[in-house]
Amino acid sequence: LRKKLQRKEKVICVEFDPPMDCRIERFMNDAEYLKEQGIDAITIADCPIARARVDSSLLACKLHRELGIDVIPHMTCRDRNINATKALLFGLNIEDIYNVLVVTGDPIPAADRQEVKGVFSFNSQLLAGYIRDLNETTFPHPFLIFGALNVNAANFKQELLKAKQKIQQGVQAFLTQPIHSAKGLQNLQQAHRELDAWILGGVMPIVSYRNALYMKNEIAGIEVDDAILSRYEHKNREEAAVLAVTIAKATIDEMVSFVDGFYLITPFHRVEIMQQIIAHIQQMDD
């Protein structure tokens, strides 16, 4: 992955949420299917919305070992102290996994806080700096450190400042939040001008009107233009899937000049939708 970015080739990374239990077959089958489509890496969230799922780093090891594909496990500051984090990084390096996305992590839901306590002894910037120091002193093969970039932030000037601070701490590449607005595209263009780092533009297909409403109103960090929302009204499942691919392709066409690759987020295991989007990106390269 690092070498392809260094050669200025557009990379394709696809995100899957890990399973919520030990039933792993569908996840592995979908991952193998997407590998066959020619993607460059799979990214794995670390217990999104602070709900326990299969550990992202352990799952990354399984994917890399069994499928031979590059992986980017996410690593939050929510659930581990610095000792546990260092131990996990040692394990990843031994397993030949050299990419990691550092994020502070979603807070523990209020209803769970009596039983589950967040750690948060450091944030994503400090974690990036810690890994950078280990890269320079300890690891035989350095990690490529990814960070998150919210191109939908209300105060994008402040978001850019945070991104520059992350770069100073060792972040070399960013995955952006999904882009579903003109504002998001404008901010992406500004980030491309100002940040000395690789940027992978976020694309998350919207698969229904209900899905669009939920993303617009309930998910922090995502903005959906009303013009996009209205296009999903009265669409059935098949029509919405076609529209999802159409809009994703158009977004990719608009962002391609400002990114070093694409960060595709799979909605509800709909890998058949992702396949069409991946094929579109590959045709652009041809």
Model-derived regions, located:
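Structural motif
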Residues: 37, 66, 95, 169, ...
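Active-site-adjacent beta->alpha loops and helix N-cap segments on the catalytic face
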Residues: 2-4, 23-25, 50-63, 81-87, ...
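Active-site cofactor/substrate anionic-group-binding motifs, chiefly glycine-
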Residues: 38-78
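Conserved N-terminal beta1-alpha1 strand-loop-helix module at the mouth
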Residues: 1-44
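Active-site pocket-lining/capping segments in soluble small-molecule metabolic enzymes
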Residues: 1, 105, 118-138, 148-152, ...
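Active-site-proximal loop/turn and secondary-structure-junction residues that shape catalytic pockets
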Residues: 16-20, 46-50, 77-79, 104-108, ...
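Active-site mouth loops of central-metabolism enzymes
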Residues: 8-26, 71-83, 143-158, 233-246
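Hydrophobic faces of well-ordered beta-strands that scaffold small-molecule active sites
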Residues: 12-18, 42-44, 71-75, 100-102, ...
